Amino acid sequence: VFLVGYHSGVGEASANMDHSYGGRTFHDVRINGKYMNESTINSAYAGYHGVPVGLVIGDSALQKQLITDGMMPWVEFVKTKDSLSMMSAKFRPKGVLRQETIEAVIKVLDGDYTSLPVYKIDAPYTLRIEFNMRTMFDFAMLLPGAKAVDGRTIEIHFDDYEELFNGVMAVCYIVGMAYPFDAPRR
């Protein structure tokens, strides 16, 4: 699996696109107590199916999370831009980025697939999501199995990662409907 166009998860300093699925909704996502971003949630889904992630293409803030901070230090990574702040980034030259991407793809495809680690999380799974706003929490509490941790955080337990993955998607869509209720009024 190649993950293309990814960004850091919520809260990474200097990140210009930090979010996890629902940029307006999710404040923190954890599986079995471990901080997760879109890259690791999706990599665990690939891992559930026995498929490794060989390449990630994304910004410097994600590179810090995956490589420097050790979330997935083995993965081949191509940095698309240097994130400077929430509203700014320094993009790399298109020609350089194209060449680095070609080289990374060739390196992964010419390598030994069987030596690539498969990103897995052991079952059973506890999904914990903290929302940006209370109304989002209220909508999420309508989901079967959702338990309140506090006024903005839910937990749902799963035995199967595919069900967890679908649960993340369902939560994202359901709480997205809450956004207009919490939007600033004029």
What is the predicted function of each stretch?
Residues 5-12, 36-52, 178-186:
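Charged, low-complexity, helix/coiled-coil-prone segments
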Residues 17-20, 69-74, 144-147:
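Short, solvent-exposed amphipathic alpha-helical segments in soluble enzyme
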Residues 31-140:
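Glycine-rich, Lys/Arg-enriched anion-binding loops that position phosphate/diphosphate groups
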Residues 100-186:
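C-terminal accessory domains and tails appended to enzymatic cores
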